[in-house]
């Protein structure tokens, strides 16, 4: 399985680590740490040297309770960073956005992947993504970032996320986005309680019936902190456990804050799966 974008190829026969680069003042874990161009490029360099093959640049926090930012502000935060990374590093670039204007400008700046927590539901986003021809990560979220964690409820969380993927794939194909351009993200922590999150993690491998890449992000999230009763800065161990469990089930892209540690964990996963004949655990 491979992804093609902007003349580049991403081989998905092994797990890739996607390093998180939040250029925001209010992200839940690292808000404000990298929201200048110099600091953002410096952190991107650290992640690339640590083994990240994808850098995910986001200019709007999607933490629970987060407020939206204007198009102009998000463009000002994201585009200079995307351009700088594209010019300096041999790495795939993902843009974490829901806005059509940012999608178009990010594609021009050198982005390879659109990572949209709202699955192209904002007006004009679907059309913008289709125009760029870039791969798109479709994420499941119940509600919106401002209210999603107030009282998430499902009759069957796996069935509902699965149904959502079916609907979104069909919607994208109708708009002219080829199925092979899509990635699927169950949306850990987005409108889900502890039980919902671990049910999805336990059954993650079942989503391979779509024959599409799986992107997962559990790094430093509440599903780790609540279980272990620790704050964001003390969630590395739990985050690594989640990453390994996901990769052993065949998740191709692991989105994380702690790149070096996750890259090393993925080497262990790869060695184990190789010894098993490259068959994932289900």
Predicted regions and their residues:
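Active-site-adjacent loop and "lid" segments of alpha/beta metabolic enzymes
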Residues: 5-6, 12, 29-38, 42-43, ...
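Short acidic capping loops at alpha-helix termini that bridge into adjacent secondary structure
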Residues: 178-181
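Catalytic domains of carbohydrate-active enzymes, especially glycoside hydrolases
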Residues: 42-58
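Extended, charged alpha/beta regions that create polyanion-binding interfaces
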Residues: 1-2
């Amino acid at each position: 399985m491979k992804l093609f974008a902007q003349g580049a190829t991403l081989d998905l026969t092994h797990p890739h680590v996607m390093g998180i680069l939040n250029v925001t003042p209010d992200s839940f874990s690292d808000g404000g740490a990298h929201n200048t161009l110099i600091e953002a490029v410096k952190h991107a360099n650290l992640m690339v040297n640590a083994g990240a093959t994808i850098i995910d640049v986001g200019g709007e926090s999607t933490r629970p309770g987060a407020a939206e930012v204007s198009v102009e502000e998000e463009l000002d935060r994201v585009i200079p960073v995307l351009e700088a990374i594209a010019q300096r590093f041999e790495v795939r670039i993902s843009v974490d956005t829901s806005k059509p204007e940012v999608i178009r400008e990010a594609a021009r700046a050198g982005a390879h992947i659109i990572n949209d927590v709202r699955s192209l539901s904002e007006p004009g986003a679907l059309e913008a993504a289709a125009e760029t021809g870039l791969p798109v990560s479709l994420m499941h979220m119940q509600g919106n970032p401002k209210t999603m964690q107030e009282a998430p409820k499902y009759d069957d969380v796996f069935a509902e996320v699965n149904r959502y993927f079916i609907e979104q794939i069909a919607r994208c194909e109708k708009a002219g986005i080829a199925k092979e351009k899509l990635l699927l993200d169950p949306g850990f922590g987005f409108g889900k309680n502890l039980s919902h999150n671990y049910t999805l993690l336990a059954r993650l491998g079942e989503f391979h019936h779509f024959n599409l890449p799986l992107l997962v992000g559990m790094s430093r999230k509440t599903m780790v902190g609540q279980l272990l009763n620790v704050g964001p800065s003390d969630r590395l161990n739990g985050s690594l456990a989640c990453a390994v469990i996901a990769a052993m089930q065949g998740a191709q892209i692991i989105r994380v804050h702690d790149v070096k540690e996750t890259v090393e964990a993925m080497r262990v996963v790869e060695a184990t799966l190789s010894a098993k004949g490259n068959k994932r655990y289900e």
